[in-house]
Amino acid sequence: MKLPRKVYLIDTNVVLRYLLGDHPEFSPKAETFMFDVSKGVKKAEILDVVIVECIYVMEKYYEIPKTEIVEKLSGILNFSGIVNPDRSEILEALLKYEN
């Protein structure tokens, strides 16, 4: 009998370390993990609250423009290994946030 694949729940820090590359220890680990998710080697879900937290930190603390934030987060949500059942709704909300 084949067991179901593990689905990882990605938190805000993993997303931020991956996108910002600002931590000497954790950013490379996040990059390796997210590379596997991008190729579908690992399956993962990113809750909508994590997306909201990422937006807040990138906009308020790092002063990243909305268009860049939306581009980065949309890119991640379109990784092969992302299994969010509400992916289309989150992507639509990102577009509304941008405008």
Residue ranges and their predicted role:
Residues S27-A30, I51, I90:
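A general structural signal for well-ordered alpha-helical segments in protein cores
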Residues M1-I46, Y62-E71:
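Short, well-structured N-terminal submotif of metal-dependent ribonuclease cores
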Residues L3, G81-N99:
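Active-site neighborhoods of divalent-metal-dependent phosphate/nucleic-acid chemistry enzymes
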Residues I46-V50, D86-E89:
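Short, conserved alpha-helical segments within structured domains
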Residues V14-V15, E53-V57, G75, E92:
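A general alpha-helix detector
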Residues D36-V37, I76, K96:
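Hydrophobic helix-cap positions at the C-terminus of alpha-helices
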Residues I55-G81:
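Active-site-proximal, substrate-binding regions of enzyme catalytic domains
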